[in-house]
Amino acid sequence: MISVNFHKKDPSEKIKEATLNLLAEKGYEAISMRKIAKEANVALGQLTYYYKTKDSLIVLVVKEVLEAFYNEFEEKVNNSDNKIEVIVDGIESVLKEETKIERLLITVISQAQVNKKLQKILGDSWSKILNLIATCYMNEYEKLTMEHASLKSRLLVSSAIESIVEKILKVEFSTDNQATLIREAAEKLGEE
């Protein structure tokens, strides 16, 4: 579902792509500027020329990934007649295909507890996604108040996050089963 296209010939973009890959594979604490430079195949001096600290680089990469995710998600939703279906399809796509993004999300959520910049970026993105879903519920089901639509969007996203955690932890997880449950939940949320 998500496509962040870093321009691979530009050293700055190679660095961002390497950071994204390492964050998703190893987690925040396990990476260093040296490891990022090695993964990007650039000299450490070149890395620090573009990005002074690991934190500033990670914050930038996370911000770009979340913006790309939201923009792609919003465009697909806005270009559809059945917006709730597109939302559920997007969640299903992440559950079936996007292991790197799932791991990145869990890493960023855990790191946001101690990094205020990441906390703000993640919180802003989270709010935008929840508002988009709530607006779709309100438009689809005209009887809903914004308060109820907001609650329904949170329940749907919470189900998706729970499924991502279960998938990562390999806790009795079946992608098809989870996707079906989320699809059914989305439909039931609209009926109430």
Model-assigned labels for residue ranges:
Residues M1-D10:
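N-terminal intrinsically disordered/low-complexity leader segments
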Residues K14, A18-S56, L60:
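Helix-turn-helix
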Residues L60, E74-K100, K152-L156, T175, ...:
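Hydrophobic alpha-helical connector segments
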Residues K63-F69:
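Short, basic, alpha-helical segments at the C-terminal edge of helix-turn-helix-like DNA-binding modules
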Residues G90-I91, L105-I109, L156-A160:
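Short alpha-helical scaffolding segments that buttress acidic/His motifs in well-ordered protein cores
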Residues E97-G123:
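Amphipathic alpha-helical segments used for helix-helix packing
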Residues Q119-G123, S127, N139-L189:
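Hydrophobic/aromatic-rich alpha-helical bundle segments in the mid-to-C-terminal region
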